[in-house]
Each structure stands twice: as C-alpha cells, then as structure tokens.
Amino acid sequence: MPSPSRKSRSRSRSRSKSPKRSPAKKARKTPKKPRAAGGVKKPSTLSMIVAAITAMKNRKGSSVQAIRKYILANNKGINTSHLGSAMKLAFAKGLKSGVLVRPKTSAGASGATGSFRVGKAPASPKKAKKAKSPKKKSSKNKSNNAKAKKSPRKKAAVKKSTKSKAKKPKSPKKKAAKKTARKSPKKKARKSPKKKAAKKSKK
C-alpha cells in the first residue's frame, strides 16, 4: 500500500502538469461611429405637399391623389401605410396656417378631399429688417448730440465778434457831436453885439 505522503505528492505533480487556464479575453466593443452633425433630415409631409403642388402648376388646384402620387415618386423611403394619416394632419395644419388654400371648385370639401392650392404665407423677412433700423437711428442721434454740444461754442464766438464790430463805429459819432455843440454858440454870441453898436454910432 502506498503511503499517504506519496499520494499527496502525486496529486501536487498532476496539478502542476495540468495546463493553466488562460483568462477569458474580454470582447472588444467596436466603437460606434458618431452620426454626422447636420445630416440630411427627411422633409415634413406639409413641405412635400407644397413641393408637389408647386411642381404640378395646376391653376384649379391639385387633387389629393395627384399629390400622393408625386410624393411617392419623388421621395424615397416613405411608409405608404402611414402616409394617408400624415397627409390628413398636414392638410389641416396647412389650411389653418394659410400655407394651403382650397380653390372655389372644392370650397365645400372637408378633410383630405377635393383639391388644394398653395396660399400666400406671411412674409417674415420684413420683420427682421424693421428690427435692424433702430441701430442706425441711435448712431444718428449720437452724431446729432455731438453737434449740439459743439454748436454753443461757435455761437458764443459769433456773438463776441458782432459786439466788437458794433462798438467800433460808435466812437467817431460821439466826437463829431461834441465839436458841433462847441462851435455853434461862439459864432452867434460874438457877431450879434458888434453890428448893433455900429448902427448907433452913425446916428
């Protein structure tokens, strides 16, 4: 009978000879490609309807069936089963906003029936132009305020020049008036008594 020490040694040798289990390799996750920013978005059903009506150029309006055919022919990847319900919502939205209008021939129609035309949408770019105008006015007001501040100095200089010009011509007039006042009484006082004395001596 083999001793128990030998059995333990044989077991340890068998364990050492057995190949080591390699650790399970972790599966590498393939990185997802980021979606390109600003990718091509699918147009809305209302925009597709407007494009179909403008392309067909029918004065009396385009029917719902003709619009549907044009959308399916010119737009790929559209689910035909959901297109009918999407068109109904788009027609209702377009009539409320004024983008779509019914012609006189289909005035009594309702829902997604009859024919449709493109209406006149409210012009948005005009509002943007009006918003920019106050900036120009503010720059003009600044220039006017700067001119108003500078103008009083010019007026003061003009007033001083006018006063100096007005004072100069007054000085010779005063001297001339004094000279005439002095000369007139002397001539009358001296001449008058001499003539009367000569007449009395002759008698």
Curated annotation (Swiss-Prot):
PROSITE patterns: H15. GO terms for biological process: cell differentiation; chromosome condensation; nucleosome assembly; spermatogenesis. PL-II* and PL-IV are produced by post-translational cleavage of a common precursor. Sperm. Residues 1-46, 104-203 are annotated as: Disordered. Keywords: Chromosome, Developmental protein, Differentiation, DNA condensation, DNA-binding, Nucleosome core, Nucleus, Spermatogenesis. This is Sperm-specific protein PHI-2B/PHI-3.
